[in-house]
């Protein structure tokens, strides 16, 4: 069952790849503007905890920032230090990787980061606990985006690998 009132437009979304110190400063300036909610995602070289983080992405409904956290650490640290509420799909995976990436005694702990993070995977289970094979939407990010955002949204993961 489609719920059109939940569908959000993605027209006008601007994605900023951080490729220079000026880009990193722009990302930090964006973080300082103050936001009600910031989505965060990590891309790793594997699915286990010891996989290396190759990209960190964060943003809102209009602006996204994508960066290699090994080259541009300051915006990622600023995100961790900010008090803005975060949202992530399968948040423990992303938050654990962020905490490991920013391993330093003065940085927020996993508990601190999780306390201000909403996990959309948990929300998806609350909305419909059924898996796709059982007649539900499923709980994967692509299936949820197709249902609630845009059924024609491209599979960016597939496109990145193509």
Predicted regions: what is each one?
Residues 2-19, 51-162:
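Active-site-proximal helix-loop-helix substrate-binding element of RNase H-like nuclease domains
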């Amino acid at each position: 069952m489609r719920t059109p009132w939940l569908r959000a437009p993605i027209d006008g979304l601007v994605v900023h790849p951080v490729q220079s110190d000026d880009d990193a400063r722009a990302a930090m300036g964006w973080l300082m503007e103050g936001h009600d909610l910031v989505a965060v995602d990590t891309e790793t070289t594997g699915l286990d905890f010891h996989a290396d983080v190759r990209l960190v992405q964060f943003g809102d409904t209009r602006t996204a920032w994508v960066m290699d956290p090994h080259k541009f650490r300051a915006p990622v640290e600023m995100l961790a230090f900010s008090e803005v509420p975060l949202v992530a799909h399968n948040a423990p995976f992303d938050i654990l990787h962020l905490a490991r990436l920013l391993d330093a005694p003065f940085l927020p702990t996993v508990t601190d980061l999780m306390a201000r993070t909403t996990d959309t995977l948990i929300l998806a289970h609350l909305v419909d606990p059924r898996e796709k094979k059982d007649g539900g939407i499923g709980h994967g990010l692509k299936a949820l985006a197709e249902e609630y955002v845009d059924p024609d949204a491209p599979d960016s993961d597939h496109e990145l690998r193509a």
